[in-house]
Amino acid sequence: MIAIGTTLEEKVFFLDRALLKAYADASGDQNPIHQNEEFALSVGLPNVIAHGMLTMALVGKYVSDWAGGAAGVKEFSARFVKPVIVPADQRVDVTVSGVVSAVVDDRITIQLSATSAGVVVLEKSEAVVIK
């Protein structure tokens, strides 16, 4: 039974520079802050950062997997608060979790959280699913 307060199982995704390159190629977003460490540092970032929409896509996958497919996801929103930092030659985690905050008929509202290296990267994130 799904009820208010139900905690969804946490999922950890891993990102590295190769994934950022593949995402940049697929999305057409070749902004050098996502691939060039020297450039990222020159504009005040701590290192190369993941594409925000890649981070949001991982959270979306988490929700759609839980909902039994993308068709069950009726609403999805998030607020970016910190970038996911991806140093060279390292895999970094994006850990996603959720808690049911409302159940009305067949509509379930989930409050979502995403962290990387223990730092909150998305907040005020919410999904509404039909299950």
Label the model's feature ranges.
Residues 1-50:
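Catalytic strand-loop segment that frames the active site of acyl-thioester-processing enzymes
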Residues 1-8, 88-131:
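HotDog/MaoC-like acyl-thioester-processing domains
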Residues 10, 73-75, 124:
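Hydrophobic residues on conserved beta-strands that form the core of alpha/beta folds
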Residues 12-14, 79, 128-130:
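Generic structural detector for well-ordered beta-strands
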Residues 17-18, 40, 56, 64, ...:
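Generic secondary-structure boundary signal with a strong preference for alpha-helix termini
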Residues 43-46, 56-95:
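Hydrophobic beta-strand-centered segment that forms part of the acyl-chain substrate-binding groove
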